Amino acid sequence: VGPTGVGKTTTVAKLAAAYSLAAAKGSRPLNVRVITIDNYRIGAKQQIEIYGNIMNIPVSCAETPSDLKALIDMYQDVDIILIDTIGKSPKDYSRIAEMRHFLDAVGQVSDVHLAMSATTKASDMREIMQQYETFGYGSLIITKFDETTCVGNIISALDEKKQSLAY
């Protein structure tokens, strides 16, 4: 989960590739599926589908909470399901609540990560972390490290909120 423009879709694609390729070197390939619930941003579905086609990883689109639940149930035997979520402003409380309702339909989710850009100001990072607490994220994914030379804001925000870094 995370605000708009931080690279959630690209990160999901990178994680899908990493999980499937890393496992291919082992005894058996990991069975990875990607589900997008981003029916809001123009071209979002097509973007993740292109990534999936390139990597030969199935991508599905859930338009409703019940669609998402059905897809999760259908994929219960796969190793990893990655869900590409809608980017929302941390100040858009109604949209965040709507997405929370969407994800609640799934039931127990193993891991929720909050994605944030390394270029985000420390004060904005703290606000984003607070607003997205409703999703029960366990760690952060920091994107766009190549776009900044200062990482103190990230370290400060993680330390203040006692959060760990996943990727």
Protein language model regions, located:
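Switch II (G3) loop of P-loop NTPases
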Residues: V1-T4, P29-G43, I50-L68, I72-E98
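Conserved lysine of the Walker
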Residues: K8
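Hydrophobic positions on the alpha1 helix immediately C-terminal to the Walker A/P-loop
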Residues: T11, L15, Q47
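Walker A/P-loop NTP-binding motif
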Residues: A16-A22
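Conserved catalytic-core segment of NTP-binding enzymes
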Residues: R33, T64-D73, I80, P90-Y167
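Short, glycine/polar-rich helix-capping loops at beta-to-alpha or helix-loop-helix junctions
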Residues: G43-K45, G152
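Short, aromatic/basic amphipathic alpha-helical patches
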Residues: Q47-E49, A157
